[in-house]
């Protein structure tokens, strides 16, 4: 059983502020603190760490659209970041992931492939592949104004299968999850299938694979469901079952789901949702899983009501190892007020807030977005 170290470095981006935060979480003291505020090229709403752990990739919310790679500098008391390269993007990206050949970007109207060098740095060149996700008259709207609106109504995420041979792209606007085959020698993609969501109003936002490679969890932004799909023939996804993040009595139209992630042992799946307006708290929900990745029950094992709506965030990122008492640690970011929490979860006791840090100041409203654990 994997056991957490005594402390972790965590990197955190924001939606609008040019800062990258280095945080440390002391597992035994159960304490989270800011160690460094690194200079950033803009607001980084999504972060990804290269497979070797030496490069940070980031989306940039700003004009002109671009993507960024940073060197992760280690050797001191805590990790810091150093800019390695900016590259232009046709549209503002919402999500990136990487292997040792390429970085993949979901940016609303399309999915892009950017190549990286042997050190993981983005090459100083445009995307080598772009897959248009728009259909019919939608293509006429695909111009420079499709920034945040494009992300809200288009391709929103990109994640690789555990063996690195497939890329899953959740597309809110097309109500589907696209599958691409990955050439591991070159990093290039080939479109494989378009997998329509179960409900006409689902709006897939993120698609996260189980370590066994056969199950993919699709987070539905509009309906607040976490759905399990099975990879059927290496080309298509088949719906199995789903659980709702919010309680039955809540109005789905007042929420927009944000994130889906697994516990370190892949025996629990977590989903989070935000309130559409201030005064509507969001939820983080957990379901126990069978060893094959299917739901033990689609009824929630535990729910946690968040302190605020979460703003644009209420994003969870799970610690890669269990805590000393078998607990699952995760970060929860809030952009409404501007704080980050560490949550601990066990299937027996549910969720608890371990620590909280206010990031916003009286002089500046800072909007925490997402984190990565190092």
Curated annotation (Swiss-Prot):
A Pfam family of this chain: Lactonase
Isomerase listed as a keyword: yes
EC number of the protein: 5.5.1.1
Gene3D superfamilies (alphabetical): YVTN repeat-like/Quinoprotein amine dehydrogenase
GO molecular function, a single term: 6-phosphogluconolactonase activity
Substrates-to-products reaction catalysed: (S)-muconolactone = cis,cis-muconate + H(+)
Keyword terms of this UniProt record: Isomerase
Protein's pathway: Aromatic compound metabolism; beta-ketoadipate pathway; 5-oxo-4,5-dihydro-2-furylacetate from catechol: step 2/3
EC class: isomerase
GO biological process: beta-ketoadipate pathway
Function, as annotated: Catalyzes a syn cycloisomerization.
Subunit structure: Homotetramer.
Family named by the database record: Belongs to the cycloisomerase 2 family.
Protein name stated in the entry: Muconate cycloisomerase 1
Organism: Cutaneotrichosporon cutaneum (Yeast)
């Amino acid at each position: 059983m994997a056991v957490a170290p005594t402390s972790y470095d965590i990197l955190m981006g924001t939606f609008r502020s040019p800062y990258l935060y280095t945080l440390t979480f002391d597992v035994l003291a159960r304490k989270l603190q800011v160690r460094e505020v690194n200079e950033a090229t803009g607001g980084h709403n999504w972060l990804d760490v290269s497979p070797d752990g030496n490069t940070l990739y980031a989306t940039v919310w700003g004009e002109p659209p671009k993507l960024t790679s940073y060197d992760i500098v280690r050797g001191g008391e805590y990790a810091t970041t150093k800019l390695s390269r900016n590259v232009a993007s046709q549209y503002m990206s919402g999500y990136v992931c990487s292997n040792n050949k390429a970085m993949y970007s979901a940016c609303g109207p399309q999915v892009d492939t950017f190549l990286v060098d042997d050190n993981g740095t983005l090459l100083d060149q445009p995307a080598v592949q772009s897959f248009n996700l728009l259909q019919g008259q939608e293509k006429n709207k695909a111009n420079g104004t499709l920034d945040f609106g494009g992300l809200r109504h288009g391709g929103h995420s990109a994640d690789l299968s555990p063996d690195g041979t497939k890329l899953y792209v959740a597309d809110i606007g097309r109500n589907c999850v696209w599958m691409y085959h990955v050439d591991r020698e070159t990093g290039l993609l080939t479109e494989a299938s378009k997998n329509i969501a179960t409900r006409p109003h689902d709006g897939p936002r993120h698609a996260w694979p189980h370590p066994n490679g056969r199950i993919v969890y699709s987070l539905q932004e509009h309906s607040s469901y976490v759905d399990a799909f099975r990879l059927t023939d290496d080309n298509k996804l088949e719906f199995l079952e789903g659980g709702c993040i919010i309680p039955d009595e809540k109005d789905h139209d007042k929420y927009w789901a944000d994130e889906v992630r697994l516990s370190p042992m892949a025996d629990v799946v977590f989903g989070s949702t935000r309130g559409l307006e201030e005064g509507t708290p969001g939820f983080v929900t957990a379901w126990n899983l069978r060893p094959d990745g299917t739901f033990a029950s689609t009824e929630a094992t535990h729910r946690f009501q968040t302190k605020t709506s979460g703003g644009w965030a209420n994003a969870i990122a799970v610690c890669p190892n269990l805590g000393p008492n078998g607990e699952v640690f995760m970060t929860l970011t809030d952009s409404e007020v501007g704080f980050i929490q560490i949550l601990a979860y066990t299937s027996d006791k549910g969720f608890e807030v371990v620590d909280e840090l206010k990031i916003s100041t009286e002089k500046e409203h800072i909007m925490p977005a997402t984190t990565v654990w190092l």
